[in-house]
Amino acid sequence: MRKHMSTIIAILVFITGLSLLLYPTVSNYWNSLHQSRVVANYSDTMAKLSKQDKQAEIDRAVEYNSSLASNGGRFTLSESELSEYKSLLNADGTGMMGYITIPKIGVKLAIYHTVDESVLQVGVGHLEGSSLPVGGSGTHCVLSSHRGLPSAKLFTELDRMKKGDVFYLHVYDRVLAYQVDNIAIVEPNDYGLLEIEEGKDLCTLFTCTPYGINTHRLLVRGHRVENVMDEKNLTADAARVNPLVVASIIGLILYGIGYVVYRIKKRGV
């Protein structure tokens, strides 16, 4: 009886340890796979819209952005303003505006309205009150996501970005390229570097820093440049997982199962 009990305990310990070991890898893979599907669904929705409908939505967003420049308290929205904001660039009704690709760190993530916690857990949030991601002179789009989650990479490696690196916003039929020109660390409530600058087309990515402490905010700002790179087929993390990693995980699981079965048979003799 004691032998069987010790075997059961050994199995439970093994399974628990293996689960803890594999959770970050498996969870991040699952989230990346989900992101790939979300982006594919978004692309399908865009393909079904007429050019006229897509242009009409872009025009609405451009008009909205024009009204922000004169709104000093634009980062604090009333209920009616929030409702109007959420109705823009929302073709499929999910709140997805488009998606961002960052080749330097292998990121391809959906962009949603607001920076609510539920959004930042799974993708990239658009800071309400900042310019919508359609570009144009006198605009400043601000996007955010979490860093250091065990379940998803998201903006975990944003600190690897350097001046000169380029990231892309895919919104409706547009692919907007931004080249990093400024990197800063600020207090959580410091919006000074997020202001609209006359004549400039800017986009800032931000996340928490330092890693695991999260007392400040890392800002990575880019200015609009000509899109000369063919990066439309950037492979999402889920599709480019190293085969050696997958093989190692499968091998470890099979070895563990085989070892447990061997111990059970040996004790049963």
Sequence positions of predicted segments:
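N-terminal Lys/Arg-rich, disordered targeting/topogenic segments
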Residues: 1-2, 269
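C-terminal single-pass membrane-anchor helix
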Residues: 233-269
